[in-house]
């Protein structure tokens, strides 16, 4: 009887240790998702959020990620987020290519760079341009 109880306790101890290891390895993702969930929950029920209204709408529309975090303290930020044309284009890229927000934003930015004569790495495509490397 004592051996079975000990094995049972060891099993659950190993399960809990495994859960803690996984949670520790993913703590940044868990922190971001929790923050995003709380902002959405507060805005849905009319509670106070510390981000301006433009960013709340962008967050609800899926225009946020860990790399483009809208849940940071930006209540005094006067910017209005992405303009409507950019949002529509990024949304279209996300739906057509099945990409997440970060990847769709990269595709959109790369296309905008190309339209203005800039390579995807940020270097000008103009053959007359002179650059200096360190």
From Swiss-Prot:
Signal peptide (residue range): 1-23
Pfam families listed in its UniProt record: DUF2015
Keywords: Signal
UniProt keyword Signal, yes or no: yes
TM regions (residue ranges): none
Domain of life, per lineage: Eukaryota
Coiled-coil portions: none
Family in the record: Belongs to the UPF0357 family.
PANTHER family: UPF0357 PROTEIN YCL012C (PTHR28023:SF1)
Protein's recorded name: UPF0357 protein AAL017W
Annotated organism of origin: Eremothecium gossypii (strain ATCC 10895 / CBS 109.51 / FGSC 9923 / NRRL Y-1056)
